[in-house]
């Protein structure tokens, strides 16, 4: 029998990103939609691993299915700690930014703190898997790239 893992995310693009890879390894990734469950979770952790833990525990406790949850943190080299987006990439000073505001905000960070029109940036992935009441955690850098001071033309 194929192993099943519940992915504690409402983001179907995230599910799609892992689905085929896990299937090839004999693991069927189930989405929240697949099992028709949705829990209102307040992701109020101080960092990505805490947020992933909150999501994983909520869905594992409700279903007792092996559960995987993840959260990403954005880290930008060379900017002050209080300006680090962390888990709030789209939220600045408590306000949710639309796409244009986001581009303007990050472009201005590069103009203020960047060297040669760019800032080194990385995504740090935090993952929690709960199986048979045992918790495993993983944190690693998934992508490294530059933020630049001129938005790309569409």
Segments predicted by a language model, with ranges:
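Anionic-ligand binding patches
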Residues: 3-6, 13-154
């Amino acid at each position: 029998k194929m192993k099943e893992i519940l992915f504690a995310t409402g983001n179907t693009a995230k599910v799609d990103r892992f689905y085929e890879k896990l299937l090839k390894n004999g693991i069927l990734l189930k989405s929240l939609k697949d099992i028709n469950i949705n829990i209102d979770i307040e992701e109020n952790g101080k960092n990505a691993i805490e947020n992933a833990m909150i999501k994983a525990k909520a869905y594992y406790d409700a279903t007792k299915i092996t559960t995987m949850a993840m959260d990403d943190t954005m880290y930008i080299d060379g900017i002050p700690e209080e300006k680090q987006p962390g888990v709030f990439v789209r939220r600045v000073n408590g306000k949710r930014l639309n796409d244009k505001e986001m581009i303007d905000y990050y472009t201005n960070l590069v103009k203020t703190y960047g060297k040669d029109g760019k800032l080194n940036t990385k995504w740090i992935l935090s993952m929690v898997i709960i199986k048979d009441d045992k918790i495993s955690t993983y944190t690693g850098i998934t992508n490294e790239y530059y933020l630049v001071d001129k938005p790309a033309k569409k």
